[in-house]
A protein has these predicted regions:
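Transmembrane beta-barrel domains of Gram-negative outer membranes and organellar outer membranes
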Residues: 19-248
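Bacterial Sec-dependent N-terminal signal peptides
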Residues: 1-23
């Protein structure tokens, strides 16, 4: 009887695990507090186009983020992009500096208290194509917060600091994003985010987009946004896919 009960419990556990849907950090700029499940590998990739002015544009084709779940509270990450930049008819293409990092869950959501996670990353200036190498290694840190407002509505926000690798100056980062689920597959988000540097004017932006679950482990997305500040890009668009699989 005990053996039969144990087998039934194992089946139920496997079914519940299989029903857990993929949680991604794209397409918005707000990093979620979710951790990739243990022993799972998650790939998030996409296309990104940004127009800054009449003479400047940037295309990432593709962007790539790889995440691996170490345990329920920790994931490891590596990311890079293949970029094509055009400035005054001069075009450069190549691989952006590789970024290594981790995300650690610090606190689960409790009543009015949000779930909390920490994201730490470092962009290695020398691991890039010749035209995209930077003078400095560029670390970044963020505190990630998330509130469940209802069974369909969530609020996420980040606060952090980052370095761009071009100068030694630090830039403050903030993001605020709301996401809404129409049903089990279709969702949308709207977001404000920005960058604050004492040596430059503030850069504030707005974006919005949609996500669609093909399966529990496969999601597609699309988004677009505009710059709000004078130094911000005119507009940007993105589309991508995310896929998760177990390595066991």
């Amino acid at each position: 009887m005990k053996k039969r009960y144990s087998s039934l419990l194992l089946i139920v556990t496997q079914v519940l695990y299989a029903q857990e849907t993929i949680q991604t950090d794209r397409p918005d700029q707000t990093e979620s507090t979710s951790i990739t499940p243990k022993s799972n590998l998650q790939l998030e990739s996409g296309f990104f186009y940004e127009k800054t002015d009449t003479e400047s544009r940037n295309i990432s084709h593709p962007t790539l983020l790889i995440k691996y779940g170490v345990n329920k509270n920790l994931e490891l990450r590596v990311g890079t992009d293949f970029n094509s930049e055009t400035v005054y008819q001069e075009r450069n293409s190549g691989i952006s500096p590789i970024t290594l990092g981790f995300k650690a869950k610090l606190m689960e959501e409790r009543k009015l208290m949000p779930s909390l996670a920490f994201l730490g990353q470092v962009t290695l200036n020398s691991l890039a194509s010749k035209n995209f190498k930077t003078p400095y290694t560029a670390p970044s840190i963020r505190l990630l917060f998330q509130h469940t407002l209802s069974d369909k509505l969530n609020l996420g926000y980040n606060l952090g600091a980052e370095w761009n690798g071009v100068t030694p100056d630090v830039t403050g980062v903030y993001t605020v994003s709301t996401s809404y689920s129409f049903d089990e597959k279709l969702g949308m988000f709207a977001e404000f985010y920005g960058y604050l540097n004492k040596f430059e004017k503030a850069d504030h932006r707005f974006d919005a987009g949609f996500t669609y679950l093909i399966s529990n482990n496969f999601q597609v997305d699309t988004s677009a946004g505009i710059g709000i500040s004078k130094i911000s890009p005119d507009y940007f668009v993105s589309a991508g896919v995310s896929y998760r699989f177990s390595t066991k």
